[in-house]
Structure formats: structure tokens, C-alpha cells
Amino acid sequence: MEQGVALIRDLIRDVPDFPKPGVVFKDITPLLSDPRAFAYCVQALAGRFADEGVDKVIGVEARGFIIAAPVAYHLGAGFVPVRKKGKLPGAVYSYTYDLEYSTDTLEVHQDALAGGERVLVVDDVLATGGTALATKQLAEQLGARTVGFGCVLELGFLGGREKLAGVEGMEIEALVKV
């Protein structure tokens, strides 16, 4: 396991001043192009939640889709995309949440989850925790119950773990923490 984490850590690239000056973006695309690292991410997250009885895995737009879909496959679960406002056709539930200087809205199809289903939320990064909580709220609007949150990278200095601490069904599995 330590070798897998080291491989992932080595492949995450810092991109200074992206998307704006002063921000150091953590780019996971080199990790995705490495078959060993990508396989490790998927297998480690699926393994961590294998005993949770996951019915569906929710992937958060956009890079969360890349990790969540194969995790769902490994768990024998369905995959549900959560997208930004206006990107899903048909009837949706929406949840608007606060960002540092603005708001954002996530949406899910109204028929994506059934009452009582156990869902795992997967994204590429845990930053402030706002997107994770918004996704949990969407799942609950459909009557589902979250069983955890999995991600490749946790940006600990942004406080997402603290925000999710004590939130039922949002136990965190982050493969790499910085």
C-alpha cells in the first residue's frame, strides 16, 4: 500500500498560478495516464468501501467521474453522475451551496437513486468539503443514504476533513494527503 501511495504522490503535478495567480493547482492527470497508479487508486478506494453494501457510486463532475465509474464497477454498483447546473437533460434535483466568494449548483437526475439505497460519493480532490456536502444533500433528496466519501487527494490546509467531521455517512478515505 505504501508503494501505491508513493507512486500517486510522485505523479501529482503542481501547476503554479492556475486557475489564477497565487494558486498552486494539484494536477492528477499524470496519475490517470499511468496504468499502475490509476489501477491502485481505483482498487484502493473500492477495497476500502467493499464491506459497506454500496448500491451506487456518485461521481462529481468532472474528474470525479474518471475515478468513480471504475470504483462502481469494482464494487458491482451503479454509477450516478452529479453535474453542474444545466448539464443534465430531463428532470433533476438541484442543490445550491456557498463557495468562498460565490455560489455553485449541483444537479442529479430525479430517478438516479431510490429510497434506501446506500451510496458512496467519489471525487478527485477533497478541498473545503462544500462539494462533498452538497452531493450528500442531493443523495438525501432522493432518499438515499451516504456511506462514505472517497478521493485521490486531500488538501488538508483547506479544512474539508474538519467540515465533514461528525457528518453521518461521510467517513473520508483520501489516498494522499497534502
Q: At which residue positions do the language-model features occur?
A:
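PRPP-associated nucleotide enzymes
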Residues: 1-178
